[in-house]
Amino acid sequence: MSESWQQPPQTQPQQPQPPQPQHHAEPPPALAEHTLPPGTAENPLGCAVYGILLQPDPGLQPPQHAPLQAAGEPGPKCGVCGHDLAHLSSPHEHQCLAGHDRSFQCTQCLKIFHQATDLLEHQCVQAEQKPFVCGVCKMGFSLLTSLAQHHSSHSGLVKCSICEKTYKPAEAAEPATTAAPSLPAAPAPSTVTPAEQADKPYSCPICQKPFKHLSELSRHERIHTGEKPYKCTLCDKSFSQSSHLVHHKRTHSSERPYKCAVCEKTFKHRSHLVRHMYAHSGEHHLFRCNVCELHFKESSELLQHPCTPSGERPFRCGECQKAFKRPSDLRQHERTHSAERPFKCDLCPMGFKQQYALMRHRRTHKTEEPFKCGLCEKGFGQPSHLLYHQHVHTLETLFKCPVCQKGFDQSAELLRHKCLPGAAERPFKCPVCNKAYKRASALQKHQLAHCAAAEKPLRCTLCERRFFSSSEFVQHRCDPAREKPLKCPDCEKRFKYASDLQRHRRVHTGEKPYKCPNCDKAFKQREHLNKHQGVHAREQQFKCVWCGERFLDVALLQEHSAQHSAAAAAAEGAYQVAACLP
């Protein structure tokens, strides 16, 4: 088998074929001329450009191209299940399920499947869902084989992810290798059959794709024109198809229409269900690069990834020299070294380095409460908050103590509730809070809780905490380095916050940074300055009308005014005596 790309088989309606000469099936001219560099691993069953892989069974021999058979001759059959393999280009396309454990069953038609991905394809066909997306035009398909057939319809240049050369998958391209002069390439056969042309009379004038209905053609043409007539009424986004708008509106609501047939978990979007189904089957990635062995969930990710052999990481951080496989991973990592916060909240001025952090923050705003209570219409930002709120509507508590029959809303409250057998027999009751105990020693220990903090006899010299009993003091494992990691270099006193340490250091340095604007006094702490400025404010209240002096309270002003009155009376009496003298 030559080292050339093999295009995925085209699934056409089975019609009698005329006898063909016995020779090996030749690929299209453009793909045959595109050869890989020497030493590249051969992949006869897949294309790394489109991401379609048909992985063979390791226990079987490599596929051999059998001669094409004339119509009417019996073809090869599977030796286990008897399935006809004549229409398949390779026997490995038939995966016999005989002898395997079929554990995935369709809930609608009860059909059984060996793998969860087969069940997903089956359900997508029934529900007309299209989880397999083309990496070139973003068109969706229900089956992986349909996506492989669709890739051959693109006429634009496609880059090979291994040798980075470009070629046209549907037309003859320039030879990628300087080989011997080749014969003129035969024109590529038309991919539209006469029967399909009669069934689909409407064709796109740009890409020649046929359609059965005019509405389908109009919807398809928006891909080329970029028209987006469907606008969201809740935000300023617009879409080219109504289904895309319906898909987008689920981001504003709590609707989850896609349900897993295996575990009945629900999802908002079909792509989330597709990723979830891989977890049941163990096939977490369908598309694999044959050079760097990276796996991808979608063919578009395989097309866009920069291929690096042997797991190389060419993108290196300039700060910490950490290497990454993708430039997007490097850009995301570089934000940890800088103050860049490209993800801004549109409701407040806060910014975030990662998108998931922004999404988590937006739920804190009261304007976005997607989780609604079905009884009172109250909204919540988190589903756990809604679940906690719904306990209010229940007629009885969910968790009940089997001993004292006390009910609790949460299981954690029931675990914290320490109920002893025979709880009704508690003769020792506290006169302050009416709490009862079985033993007098327990009541005495409880009564210490009503005492003031100064009455606690035992004090820890490291963290200044006080305790009632010696058992509590022994159980208290004080770690000042953990609780108060900041230590004063002058007196070894520890603090929990840097601001507390900075304020304490002024005791040793004598620094007084807070100065009064009304006088020449200065203070070490801001609260001392605020208390001092109240003195100046009160001085403006009581003013003497004789001399203009100000006082803090009215009693001092009255005492001061009495001195002025006495002096004035004495002066007036002396004037009268002087006037009477001859």
From Swiss-Prot:
UniProt keyword Metal-binding, yes or no: yes
Compartments, record wording: Nucleus
Stored Gene3D superfamilies: Classic Zinc Finger
Cross-link (Glycyl lysine isopeptide (Lys-Gly) (interchain with G-Cter in SUMO2)) at residue(s): K130
Region (Disordered): 1-39, 174-198
Any coiled-coil regions, as ranges: none
Chain positions found as Phosphoserine: S281
GO MF term set: DNA binding; zinc ion binding
A single GO cellular-component term on record: nucleus
SMART domains from the UniProt entry: ZnF_C2H2
Signal sequence, renumbered to the chain: none
Example of a GO biological process term: regulation of transcription by RNA polymerase II
Segments of skewed composition (Low complexity): 1-14, 174-196
Zinc finger extent (C2H2-type): 76-100, 104-126, 132-154, 202-224, 230-252, 258-280, 287-309, 315-337, 343-365, 371-393, 399-421, 428-450, 458-480, 486-508, 514-536, 542-564
Keyword field: DNA-binding, Isopeptide bond, Metal-binding, Nucleus, Phosphoprotein, Repeat, Transcription, Transcription regulation, Ubl conjugation, Zinc, Zinc-finger
Role according to the record: May be involved in transcriptional regulation.
Stated family: Belongs to the krueppel C2H2-type zinc-finger protein family.
Name the record gives this protein: Zinc finger protein 319
Gene name for this UniProt entry: ZNF319
